[in-house]
């Protein structure tokens, strides 16, 4: 059963009523088809109203949904012959990041992504999708391998952020993230990044320096969580909803600001409602991106990536220049 979110409460009672009538029809000699059809029509109308008017905080809840498809869910649906690679060849293997070699419609590719768990046991094993330095170093090892063998790189971003623990800092968390940013900027193969859930801080950006950056419609991408921003700005984490509306963290906001290239539509209610259909939407956008990028040589790919990131923040720079005059 799909867990309902806070803003979906108006829909819950209607869904429950429809289900009760369907169950009653199975056991009683009564035809309630007409009543059920009316309720389903009412439910559809209400769903359209709710999902068409989602607030940034509503989208944060969807991005964090415990049943939202993960990197491995999409790998299973989009790629064939996936062979997972382990370890950073320096310290160990971080299961908060998965990566390996796969075929995408006959094209050899390298796939890398954050991986959170679906239950408590798996979340503990994968550290809730928050990587240690060895996770980022594993990702970079696979990226350099992909460059050596001319394989396109596809990154799935889904993390609250890099793990901030003492051990992670001792092993060079900030250096690992910075090294990824530096090296990804100069990769001579196509890099396509897709935010599929939460894109939190440097932990997300360490897999986010791509030629094309796409976001699922209800995903988020930000330097800090709404709770963290509220705690810093107003000394009150309970004001997270206000922070979410202020921070411009949604796909629509970031498309307007030029941070991302395309918004990938989600199935009604969020990707967790139908992972198969959601994978088809990702496939459509990914296929178009690779077709465009594979036409460029290595030097052109690096230049395109450089120009893309250089243009971010250009509007604010111009505004500051005008004020200075």
UniProtKB/Swiss-Prot annotation:
Name the catalysed reactions.
N(6)-carboxybiotinyl-L-lysyl-[protein] + acetyl-CoA = N(6)-biotinyl-L-lysyl-[protein] + malonyl-CoA
- Can you give the residue ranges of the CoA carboxyltransferase C-terminal domain? 35-292
Tell me one GO molecular function of this protein.
acetyl-CoA carboxylase activity
Give me the disulphide-bonded residues: none
Entry EC no(s) = 2.1.3.15
Record's keyword annotation contains Metal-binding:
no
Instruction: Specify the protein name.
Output: Acetyl-coenzyme A carboxylase carboxyl transferase subunit alpha
Q: Which HAMAP family match?
A: AcetylCoA_CT_alpha
- CC terms in the record's Gene Ontology section: acetyl-CoA carboxylase complex
What does the annotation say about its assembly with partners? Acetyl-CoA carboxylase is a heterohexamer composed of biotin carboxyl carrier protein (AccB), biotin carboxylase (AccC) and two subunits each of ACCase subunit alpha (AccA) and ACCase subunit beta (AccD).
PANTHER family noted in UniProt: ACETYL-COENZYME A CARBOXYLASE CARBOXYL TRANSFERASE SUBUNIT ALPHA (PTHR42853), ACETYL-COENZYME A CARBOXYLASE CARBOXYL TRANSFERASE SUBUNIT ALPHA, CHLOROPLASTIC (PTHR42853:SF3)
Q: Does the keyword Transferase apply?
A: yes
Q: Give GO BP annotations, semicolon-separated.
A: fatty acid biosynthetic process; malonyl-CoA biosynthetic process
Give the enzyme's main class according to its UniProt record, as a single word: transferase
State the family it belongs to.
Belongs to the AccA family.
Q: Which InterPro entries does the entry mention? A: Acetyl_CoA_COase_a_su, ClpP/crotonase-like_dom_sf, COA_CT_C
Describe which pathway this protein belongs to, using the record's wording.
Lipid metabolism; malonyl-CoA biosynthesis; malonyl-CoA from acetyl-CoA: step 1/1
Organism of provenance: Geobacillus thermodenitrificans (strain NG80-2)
Task: Report the function annotation for this chain.
Answer: Component of the acetyl coenzyme A carboxylase (ACC) complex. First, biotin carboxylase catalyzes the carboxylation of biotin on its carrier protein (BCCP) and then the CO(2) group is transferred by the carboxyltransferase to acetyl-CoA to form malonyl-CoA.
| SUPFAM superfamilies membership | ClpP/crotonase
**Subcellular location per the Swiss-Prot or TrEMBL entry:** Cytoplasm
Keyword annotations of the record:
ATP-binding, Cytoplasm, Fatty acid biosynthesis, Fatty acid metabolism, Lipid biosynthesis, Lipid metabolism, Nucleotide-binding, Transferase
